[in-house]
């Protein structure tokens, strides 16, 4: 039986490229090599596509994907050279130019099936401000927030924010993930600095009310019919779950399933599925919630390309539901082909 080609795209132009490499390495080890041939392409910070490795069997534990330190620019290709008839692309890319609709649009132009959500839902979910406004419109609870757009009157924004929110306040670039560029402010001076930091990553800044809450996450899988997981909890031993804590210091543990009341589980899974459909989601997403001590649920964000490292919540949530990592990848490939066929049928 001939193997299907799975094209892994990793690296990318955003500040989350290191997470992308970790995720892609976990995927390449989890693939069922009885069914798939894996071809990998590294995208540099400048947007160059580099042809790297090919795997017909599971790589050794010591083998690593090629990155900036090991690639050769002689392997640079035209982006369109990744095209291969019958192949499915797994764009294991995080952040801007990865999960914001850009690469998804490129792959649709190439007429290649790809894992993950489509152009529209990727771009909406990537922007935290737009996501909040969409979810508010369908009655899904959000924590209080204000918005600052680069070029607006910063002093007026500070006045509005301090009138509506109380410290602590979290400041986030609208279009970044993995906690990149996020700050916690306890004073007006810190708030101003936090906005300036966020502006180095994006021109749109979300300013959000800090809440004392547990962080609960739900996995989503499907196209027209979406399935959700039991929730898992991120248990922190740091005050703020930032990039350093997530990926460098590993100062987190996870409780899967989360220890929450059944009524809360039902509410979160319902909100997650409704939000996924409202944003036009397909393939997969991870839905992140805040759960306060008095039982209030807030939907924080939808992550359309969650981390796929061996310690990432998304694959572990599905493993808890009885879907092992290799089978999850296979299901994602099937969903990618299904949505591709549907999209193509609408163009004829």
UniProtKB/Swiss-Prot annotation:
Mg(2+) 1 binds at residues 288, 301. Pathway: Cell wall biogenesis; peptidoglycan biosynthesis. Its EC number is 6.3.2.4. InterPro entries: ATP-grasp (IPR011761), ATP_grasp_subdomain_1 (IPR013815), D-Ala_lig_Van_CS (IPR000291), D_ala_D_ala (IPR005905), Dala_Dala_lig_C (IPR011095), Dala_Dala_lig_N (IPR011127), PreATP-grasp_dom_sf (IPR016185). The keyword DNA-binding does not apply. Gene3D superfamilies: 3.40.50.20, ATP-grasp fold, A domain, ATP-grasp fold, B domain. The keyword Hydrolase does not apply. It is an enzyme of class 6 (ligase). Disulfide bonds: none annotated. It holds the Pfam family Dala_Dala_lig_C. Residues 132-334 form the ATP-grasp domain. Binds 2 magnesium or manganese ions per subunit. SUPFAM superfamilies: Glutathione synthetase ATP-binding domain-like (SSF56059), PreATP-grasp domain (SSF52440). Keywords: ATP-binding, Cell shape, Cell wall biogenesis/degradation, Cytoplasm, Ligase, Magnesium, Manganese, Metal-binding, Nucleotide-binding, Peptidoglycan synthesis. It catalyses: 2 D-alanine + ATP = D-alanyl-D-alanine + ADP + phosphate + H(+). Its cofactor is Mg(2+); Mn(2+). GO terms for cellular component: cytosol. ATP binds at residues 162-217. Mg(2+) 2 binds at residues 301, 303. GO terms for biological process: cell wall organization; peptidoglycan biosynthetic process; regulation of cell shape. GO terms for molecular function: ATP binding; D-alanine-D-alanine ligase activity; metal ion binding. HAMAP family: Dala_Dala_lig. Cell wall formation. Belongs to the D-alanine--D-alanine ligase family. This is D-alanine--D-alanine ligase. It comes from Streptococcus pyogenes serotype M3 (strain ATCC BAA-595 / MGAS315). The lineage of its organism: Bacteria, Bacillati, Bacillota, Bacilli, Lactobacillales. The gene is ddl.
